[in-house]
Curated annotation (Swiss-Prot):
It comes from Clostridium botulinum (strain Eklund 17B / Type B). Pathway: Lipid metabolism; malonyl-CoA biosynthesis; malonyl-CoA from acetyl-CoA: step 1/1. Acetyl-CoA carboxylase is a heterohexamer composed of biotin carboxyl carrier protein (AccB), biotin carboxylase (AccC) and two subunits each of ACCase subunit alpha (AccA) and ACCase subunit beta (AccD). Zn(2+) binds at C38, C41, C57, C60. Keywords: ATP-binding, Cytoplasm, Fatty acid biosynthesis, Fatty acid metabolism, Lipid biosynthesis, Lipid metabolism, Metal-binding, Nucleotide-binding, Transferase, Zinc, Zinc-finger. InterPro entries: AcCoA_carboxyl_beta (IPR034733), Acetyl_CoA_COase_Trfase_b_su (IPR000438), ClpP/crotonase-like_dom_sf (IPR029045), COA_CT_N (IPR011762), Znf-ACC (IPR041010). Residues 34-291 form the CoA carboxyltransferase N-terminal domain. This is Acetyl-coenzyme A carboxylase carboxyl transferase subunit beta. HAMAP family: AcetylCoA_CT_beta. Belongs to the AccD/PCCB family. One of its GO terms (molecular function) is carboxyl- or carbamoyltransferase activity. One of its GO terms (cellular component) is acetyl-CoA carboxylase complex. The keyword Lipid biosynthesis applies.
Amino acid sequence: MLKDLFKKSKYATVNPSAYKSKVVEEKPNIPSGMWTKCSNCNNMIYYEDLENNKYVCTKCNQHFRISPKERIKQIFDKDTFKEMWKSLKTNNPIDFEDYEEKINQSQSNTGSKEAVVTGVGRINDLEVACAIMDSFFMMGSMGTVVGEKITRIVEYATENNLPILIFTASGGARMQEGIFSLMQMAKISAALARHDEKGLLYITILTDPTTGGVTASFAMEGDIILSEPNTLVGFAGRRVIENTINETLPESFQKSEFLLEKGFIDSIVERKNMRAYLYKILILHGVNKYE
């Protein structure tokens, strides 16, 4: 009997590597790109649902950043937008190291030559000139080509008595082009002043993010300034300001809702309503139907 107490128990033997391989084999095969996570609420969203909802989170209403191509699709009448100066590209004016590689990488990623798309299109048959900045191209930074294209479309609008819409999305002036990028602020503002002298309408639509030299110039010069919800709008970064003034800023600081409260913008418009809202403004300002 005592002998039986000291007998070794019999255990089943498990091969961990065999078990692991079995688990891996049994994982469901989910195609990549089918789901995406909201950066605001961490909700997992079925990509098709996100696309059908104009790239707005179905849970918290966070507006995802979108490309100029998608913006054109949402705002303009089908097949009416005609892009202008598509082939313009930078030539690295100050020979900044690795700049060409970064430009080439952005061109490959986005399929665009630069960080802004300019052209003319129609909203319910009302013709407008438009510039749409691309945050996916070097964070929409403003260099010589971005400045030139926006200036040209503003001048085109002035010559043809058209209203101008600018959808801003930018990290500011492009450091790789030095003083040449900063010059674009004054250049675009001067073109907009000539547009204003003719009594023509300029509408700015601030989208996430709108910062730096773009905010300090043409983004805040619109006759009417609109914004998408929860858009980051500012000049210097939050940490820079806090370190400078030695104070903690409010959580809502530099958000479009904060700017609306302080009177810096006129209205916050959800993406699903933007096309209709712009149409109403154009009608109220006497914009004529396309002929």
